[in-house]
């Protein structure tokens, strides 16, 4: 009886916190197996769901635990049901029959799909900046055209948009081998259209694209400013697929409403489904990416070296990958296996060709720029006064110190008048949450970051 009350309370809290689509995907699909010795065993059908439960829902498990059991309940996640999986297997099989995967058409050879095999969900590093985009991509790969159509993912270069597109396609083909899937950059789609138009083979072009189950278009902003005929053809392709309930996933470097040079009717259609953004990885995610990229290279990247590298590049993953390539080249030439900070610094200096460009940001510089922006002195920031403008400036400065430097939590706390590390954690979480809700604050922080760098 208590277990049922406990789980219902968790679902109530989750419904308040998550969007409807995320609630359906993360909460409804989860299942409480048992509560024993203050541990709640929770079944999640996908291991990728654990991050959202840990980051977004763990605290509500604690709250529900005190309400129902008068004890702190710790979650333990499992990804295989201990027994009786028959019903779920039947349900999964039923779900797969809900979608028509063009059985009358010949499946596309993998080499013609445009997909890259190396990009999967398993090797995509999740973090706070991409968790919702990953969630949406996973949802699409589970239920084509039944969840979000189109799915529109946008963000700066090198943040994983192409990886996610390929992961969706590869996941679908793993589960439904006869699905007709096509990944193509928008520029290549345009060139393909123009080639078929020039050769008088438009029927062949239409058959290729309008018979797909899943169309994955990368960098759709490339369509901006193109001739009317080109945009018209994509518009018709989009409509043909959408009308047949076939899935479309698009990526861009900007949101639909900021796509200039596109017909309004296209922009409107891009917003029909779900739009998700990917933001640059935070410090912890950058370290996780570096660990993933370096673990099979045959070199010993020391932990302080990884932290150093994570502190040098904060904009995208490609910079991190480039730095790793430069470092391994130096290591190969020098015939060394242990990668120290000195080796990493040498590679970065050569890469940037200017030591002054390196991101070594002192916390007092962050405090100065934040203080100037909000009209708060560093002394006030380090103090304990709780006036609203001082609290905001203090929390923003702590947030940026966490995001832009590789300093430890205790070190950051010390620089703010000896604050406890939990205060820094709270400030970071608070500002991150506000950024997601308040565009004005997000723009303010972006402006401050530009001044800091």
From Swiss-Prot:
PROSITE patterns referenced in this protein's UniProt entry, alphabetically: DNAA
Segments for region (Domain I, interacts with DnaA modulators): 1-74
Stretches the record annotates as Domain II: 74-113
Residue span of region Domain III, AAA+ region: 114-331
One annotated Gene Ontology cellular component of this protein: cytoplasm
Gene Ontology terms, MF aspect: ATP binding; ATP hydrolysis activity; DNA replication origin binding; lipid binding
InterPro entries in alphabetical order: AAA+_ATPase, Chromosome_initiator_DnaA, Chromosome_initiator_DnaA-like, Chromosome_initiator_DnaA_CS, DnaA_C, DnaA_dom, P-loop_NTPase, Trp_repressor/repl_initiator
Annotated spans, Domain IV, binds dsDNA: 332-453
Regulation (activators, inhibitors): CcrZ stimulates DnaA, possibly by phosphorylation of an intermediate molecule, to initiate DNA replication.
UniProt entry keywords in alphabetical sequence: ATP-binding, Cytoplasm, DNA replication, DNA-binding, Lipid-binding, Nucleotide-binding
Pfam families per the UniProt record, alphabetical: Bac_DnaA (PF00308), Bac_DnaA_C (PF08299)
Binding residue positions for ATP: 158, 160-162
Effect on the protein upon substituting residue 247 to H: Overinitiation of DNA replication. Rescues DNA replication initiation defect of ccrZ deletion mutant
Domain description: Domain I is involved in oligomerization and binding regulators, domain II is flexibile and of varying length in different bacteria, domain III forms the AAA+ region, while domain IV binds dsDNA.
General function of this protein: Plays an essential role in the initiation and regulation of chromosomal replication. ATP-DnaA binds to the origin of replication (oriC) to initiate formation of the DNA replication initiation complex once per cell cycle. Binds the DnaA box (a 9 base pair repeat at the origin) and separates the double-stranded (ds)DNA. Forms a right-handed helical filament on oriC DNA; dsDNA binds to the exterior of the filament while single-stranded (ss)DNA is stabiized in the filament's interior. Mutations in this gene suppress a deletion of cell cycle regulator ccrZ.
HAMAP family, per the entry: DnaA_bact (MF_00377)
SUBUNIT field: Oligomerizes as a right-handed, spiral filament on DNA at oriC. Interacts (via domains I and III) with CcrZ.
Protein name: Chromosomal replication initiator protein DnaA
